């Protein structure tokens, strides 16, 4: 998947945060804090084409149902789309 905005992932005070850089600073509403699953999905984005690929990776890494994985991925990607990140 293509990440549209310039964001750098940083660890700050124990939290993983996406920090806007470049022109994105002016277009952004601030920092984006990611939970553990958000970090996992974010790291996958450059290497996957579909939502299904992300779900399959989650099922291999975490003990969750397929339904829960699909729901979590859909919510995360929808949020990124709303923010015009992907």
Which residues make up each language-model segment?
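Acidic, low-complexity/disordered tracts enriched in E/D and polar residues
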Residues: 1-43
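Long, charge-rich, low-complexity alpha-helical segments
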Residues: 30-86
């Amino acid at each position: 998947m293509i990440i549209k905005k310039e964001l750098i992932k940083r660890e700050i005070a124990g939290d993983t945060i996406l920090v806007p850089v470049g022109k994105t600073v002016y277009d952004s509403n601030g920092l984006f804090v990611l939970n553990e699953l958000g970090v996992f999905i974010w790291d996958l984005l450059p290497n996957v084409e579909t939502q299904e690929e992300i779900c399959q990776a989650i099922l291999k890494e975490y003990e969750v149902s397929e339904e829960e994985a699909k729901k979590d991925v859909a919510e995360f990607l929808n949020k990124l789309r709303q923010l015009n990140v992907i």
